[in-house]
Amino acid sequence: MGYTIDAAESGCYPGTTVLVNKFDLRSQSELDAVEAALVTAKAIQWEETPLCDTFDFAHYRAIHKHLFGELYDWAGQVRTINISKKGTQFCPAEELPRVGEAIFARVRIEHFFCGLSRERFAEELLDLYERTNELHPFREGNGRTQRVFLAQLAQNAGYRLDFSCVDADELMIATIYAAQGIDLPLKDVLDKIIKE
């Protein structure tokens, strides 16, 4: 997890940083293990049979609900608290609905990135990646939701994203740089994962 939040609004079990969950797991390592197994299976399931193809903010939230719904009551719902991580402050909670709708409206205006050259697709994907990362609409599970959404969007546009081509730490570092306005590392990462 690793988010910085107000302890009174944490949604965690008292005296811990473990999120309240449907399995009542109070050990972070146990929750991480269950979460990893469930979310991996759910991501594969979504990839094989997407439950939504509107590519709007409701679609994004539907992916989160699908991935995390067996774990958290709030899956698919935008967070109601402000969060930051590793020095990055994410979109204020009260702005999430408006900003989220605007981000995904742009995807629609750009025709879901269909018919773009690889170079142009990479530029649009970079912008959307940065915007959805800055949005960070959920209490937990933002990166995994983002990757499932972007992979589906890419497939719809005639491309494929292979996140296994990059190390998780490399992606995280590139994302941190992008949040500081330094796009090149994330551009390089996306160049590796976009397949035709």
Q: Predicted regions: what is each one?
A:
Residues 1-196:
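FIC/Doc superfamily catalytic core
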